[in-house]
C-alpha cells in the first residue's frame, strides 16, 4: 500500500512538472537573469567606485572623503541593482522603493545636522575655498587648515590651539583666505611730532622702503600724511611683499623705520594734553 502511494505521488509530481514546465522554465530564466543582474551590478559598482576614488585622489581631495564618496556611490548602485533583481523575479518593487524612501526620510530627519555637515564637506572639497596648509579666517576663529574631514575641518591657531569647526558653519559664513594670493599688502602707521618737517619724514620713510629688497617695487607703494591727530602727525605706509614673507617684512620694516627716524632726529611723540590754569578773581 505504501509503495502504491509513493508511485502515485511520483506520478502526480511528474504530471505537475509536465503541465507547468513552461511556468517553471520562466521562473528559472527570471531567477538566472536576476542573479546575472545582481552579479553584474556589483561588478560595475566596484569598477565605478574605484574610478571615482581614483579621480578624487588625483584631484587632491582628502582620502577619507574620497573613500566615503566612492563607497556611497558603490552602495547606491548596488541598491538599484538589488531592486532591479527583485523586480525580475516578480517582487513588487514599488513597495520596496516606498520602504527605502520612508527609511531614508527618517534617517535624514534624525541626522539632519550631520547630513548638513556632510553636504558642506562635499562643497568644501569640490569648490575648494580653502585647502590644507592655508591660513584662513572663518569669522570667529583664524588658523592654518590641518585637515578637511567629512563632517568637520581642523585648524591650528597661531598660539598652537587646535580648533574643530563644523563644515556647515564654514560654508554658511565668510571665508577669508590669507594664503591663496602670492602677494599681500602691509600697512604701517607712523606718528611724529607737529614740529617735524613733513617732506623730511616722507623722504626718510621712502628711503627705508626702497632699501628693502623684499618689498615689491612693481606694485603700488603709498607714503603719505593720513591724519592731523591731537598729539601727532600720522603717516601711512602701504607696500606689497610675498605672502610667505609678509610678517617678517612687517617686523623688520618697523625696526628700520624707528632707527632711521632716530638718525634724523625725528621724534615720535607721546600723547599729551594741554592744561590751562586760570586764576579766579575773588572780586
Curated annotation (Swiss-Prot):
Q: Establish whether keyword Membrane is in the entry.
A: yes
A single GO molecular-function term is: mechanosensitive monoatomic ion channel activity
Report the transmembrane regions from the record.
Answer: 24-44, 64-84, 96-116
Gene Ontology CC terms: plasma membrane
What InterPro entries does the entry give?
Answer: LSM_dom_sf (IPR010920), MS_channel_1st (IPR049142), MS_channel_C (IPR049278), MSC_TM_helix (IPR008910), MscS_archaea/bacteria_type (IPR045275), MscS_beta-dom_sf (IPR023408), MscS_channel_2nd (IPR006685), MscS_channel_C_sf (IPR011066)
Topological relation to the membrane, as annotated: Multi-pass membrane protein
Can you say where in the cell this protein is located?
Answer: Cell membrane
Q: What is its main location?
A: membrane
Per UniProt, the keywords (alphabetical) are: Cell membrane, Membrane, Transmembrane, Transmembrane helix
- Family named by the database record: Belongs to the MscS (TC 1.A.23) family.
Query: What protein name does the entry list?
Result: Uncharacterized MscS family protein BUsg_437
Organism equals: Buchnera aphidicola subsp. Schizaphis graminum (strain Sg)
Amino acid at each position: 500500500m505504501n509503495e502504491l502511494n509513493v508511485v502515485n505521488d511520483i506520478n502526480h509530481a511528474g504530471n505537475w512538472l509536465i503541465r507547468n514546465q513552461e511556468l517553471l522554465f520562466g521562473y528559472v530564466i527570471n531567477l538566472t537573469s536576476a542573479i546575472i543582474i545582481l552579479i553584474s551590478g556589483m561588478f560595475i559598482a566596484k569598477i565605478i567606485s574605484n574610478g571615482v576614488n581614483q579621480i578624487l585622489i588625483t584631484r587632491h581631495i582628502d582620502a577619507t572623503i574620497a573613500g566615503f564618496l566612492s563607497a556611497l556611490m558603490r552602495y547606491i548602485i548596488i541598491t538599484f541593482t538589488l531592486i532591479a533583481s527583485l523586480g525580475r523575479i516578480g517582487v513588487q518593487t514599488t513597495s520596496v522603493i516606498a520602504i527605502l524612501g520612508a527609511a531614508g526620510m527618517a534617517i535624514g530627519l534624525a541626522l539632519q545636522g550631520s547630513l548638513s555637515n556632510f553636504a558642506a564637506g562635499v562643497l568644501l572639497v569640490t569648490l575648494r575655498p580653502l585647502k590644507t596648509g592655508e591660513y584662513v579666517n572663518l569669522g570667529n576663529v583664524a588658523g592654518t587648515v590641518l585637515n578637511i574631514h567629512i563632517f568637520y575641518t581642523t585648524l591650528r591657531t597661531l598660539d598652537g590651539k587646535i580648533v574643530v569647526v563644523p563644515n556647515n558653519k564654514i560654508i554658511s559664513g565668510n571665508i577669508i583666505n590669507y594664503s591663496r594670493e602670492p602677494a599681500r599688502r602691509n600697512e604701517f602707521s607712523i606718528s611724529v611730532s607737529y614740529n617735524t618737517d613733513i617732506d623730511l619724514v616722507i623722504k626718510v620713510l621712502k628711503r627705508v622702503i626702497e632699501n628693502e629688497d623684499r618689498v615689491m617695487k612693481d606694485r603700488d607703494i603709498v607714503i603719505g600724511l593720513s591724519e592731523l591727530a591731537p598729539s601727532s602727525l600720522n603717516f601711512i605706509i602701504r607696500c606689497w611683499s610675498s605672502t610667505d614673507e609678509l610678517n617678517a617684512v612687517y617686523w623688520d620694516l618697523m625696526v628700520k623705520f624707528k632707527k632711521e627716524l632716530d638718525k634724523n632726529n625725528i621724534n615720535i611723540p607721546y600723547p599729551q594734553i594741554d592744561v590751562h590754569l586760570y586764576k579766579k578773581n575773588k572780586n
